[in-house]
Design a protein with these regions (language model features):
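Extracellular, repeat-based ectodomains that mediate carbohydrate processing or recognition
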Residues: 2-518
């Protein structure tokens, strides 16, 4: 055992460092989006990358539609998101198909005609189709209609302005609203209508001026009692490079005569520094009397190896004093699109894949938090990949430590030049002088290796006050014990022991600090 001590001692330290590195990788890739909020829980897959309707039943169950080639799958989950039932419908489906499903009644639109479940045409040449909770809206020939799912009869609601081909519906607690939007140059006109028994009544109208270099990309609105809020997403016109997007919000009330003003929004990154970038798929709603946005954006995450940036799901709450409070609702290295709110405590989104897209949810429900905490095969693979990437950094960091290693090497070479073969004798002062020179180099050039960025990235057990000096001295003690064992068991002379001491010390240090050097 004593003969092997020279490699066993540093090997134990290095292997422990690699294990801690892997454990940190596991911690990073499985970090919850925020406190008391679950990681993503996969509940299904779909072949399309567009909106998928979700219904919450009076009993608290969820009916989620997933699409496959020529097949609609309706899955029923309980409040813990355990699947309790499933039903499939054989209808032609692609990413353009929109489906209304209420109980066992199915009506769908193929971007041209509206069909019943048997494939019979109900309405031909329908431009748009809006499946809602218990009714359907559609646009045909510049007119907005309501389709009664019970008797399949159509009622004209309102004639739309020429060239208007889309509306934004909103299902309130008691009423159904829809918004029309028209943009001319930098003038944006919005009209809010309430659906009535006699058609539609315009309840609010306003217009906004946006920057002349911007165009409207998306709009949304929300109504709660008499409170009304608008969201505009615009894109900066640019001749080169990626377009830059902007988000605006305006708040008012139905019946108000005061013109609302657009407020530009910047979303702070709740997990990192700075702001979230490229927010998209933005929806607006009132949650517990407070205005809140749900969206996907590029923000900080430690689930990735190098970039520490990925698209995740976020919410932004706008307080009464105008402050914006962001919260992260997913934490994954994979791209997230089309976030959707199921209720106050649960969100859902698509995670893009090469052939199929995964459907995931996250929630503050304790049962979901517990269920989502289980490590998956993907978690292990991502943690291993991140660990191997960190080990590659260790190899590069070793190059930076040559500023330490070169000094004992130069000392040994110079002493051989001066003393020659006499150094092969056991000269204690030569060995200890070489060790002292190396240790002086580690302290003199301390800041070249132990840089500020390293401490910002490293875990807590490496960043306490004086940690770099404590680890340096502790590993020096281990290296010294291992080095001294070679004197009696392997008859190593001073030059070999000096070089071994420096090499073992460097390997132990970089096994712990190297992954966070850059």
């Amino acid at each position: 055992m004593r003969k092997q001590l020279f490699w066993i001692l540093p090997s134990i330290i290095i292997i422990t460092g690699i294990f801690l590195m892997f454990n940190q990788s596991i911690t990073d890739v499985t970090e919850q989006p925020e406190a008391n909020w679950s990681r993503g829980l996969e509940i299904g897959t779909t072949t399309v990358d567009k909106t998928f309707p979700v219904q919450e039943t009076p009993g608290g169950n969820f009916i989620i539609q997933t699409y496959e080639q020529d097949k609609l799958r309706a899955q029923i989950f309980n409040h813990e998101f355990k699947q309790i039932n499933e039903k499939t419908y054989d209808i032609p489906l692609d990413k353009w198909t929109r489906v209304f499903l209420n109980h066992d009644q199915l009506i769908y639109h193929d971007y041209n005609d509206i069909y019943d479940q048997d494939g019979d045409v109900i309405v031909s040449n329908a431009k748009r189709f809006y499946p809602l909770g218990s009714t359907i809206l559609y646009i045909k020939e510049n007119n907005l209609y309501e389709l009664n799912p019970d008797d399949l009869s159509s009622t004209k609601i309102v004639e739309l302005n020429k060239g208007m081909e889309d509306i934004i519906p909103f299902q309130g607690k008691k009423q159904l609203y829809f918004m029309t939007e028209q943009s001319l140059n930098n003038d944006v006109k919005l009209n809010i209508y309430e659906l009535t028994d006699n058609g539609a009544k315009r309840v609010y109208s306003t217009s906004f001026q946006i920057d002349a270099m911007q165009t409207v990309e998306d709009t949304d609105f929300a109504v709660r009692d008499s409170n009304l809020a608008f969201m505009l997403e615009t894109v900066q016109k640019q001749s080169q490079g990626s377009p830059e997007s902007y988000t605006y919000v305006a708040k008012t009330s139905i019946g108000s005569n005061r013109e609302p003003s657009l407020k530009p929004l910047t979303f702070p990154d709740p997990a990192g520094e700075g702001s979230l970038s490229e927010p998209n798929d933005i929806t607006i709603s009132y949650q517990n009397e407070t205005l809140q946005l749900l969206f996907s954006a590029n923000g900080f995450t430690e689930t990735t190896y190098q970039e520490n940036q990925a698209f995740n799901v976020y919410t932004a709450t706008i307080t009464d004093n105008g402050e914006i409070q962001s919260a992260r609702k997913s934490n994954t290295a994979k791209g997230t699109v089309d976030p959707k709110r199921l209720n106050n405590s649960t969100v859902m989104w698509l995670e893009q894949g090469s052939e199929r897209n995964n459907i995931l949810i996250s929630s503050s429900n304790p049962a979901v938090i517990d269920k989502a905490s289980t490590l998956s095969q993907d978690d292990w693979l991502r943690a291993l990949g991140k660990t191997f990437g960190m080990l590659a950094k260790v190899l590069i960091t070793i190059l930076a430590t040559t500023i330490w290693f070169i000094w004992p090497v130069v000392f040994v070479v110079l002493m051989y030049v001066v003393k020659g073969r006499k150094l092969d004798e056991d000269i204690s002062w030569f060995f200890y002088t070489g060790i002292v020179i190396y240790m002086l180099a580690t302290f003199i050039f301390h800041d070249i290796i132990f840089i500020d960025g390293m401490f910002a990235r490293a875990p807590d057990y490496l960043t306490f006050t004086g940690s770099s000096y404590i680890y340096t001295l502790f590993f020096a003690l281990i290296a010294f014990i291992a080095t001294q064992s070679t004197k009696a068991t392997h008859d190593w002379h001073a030059p070999a022991r000096i070089i071994y001491f420096a090499g073992a010390h460097i390997l132990m240090l970089v096994a712990y600090f190297g992954p966070y050097y850059f």
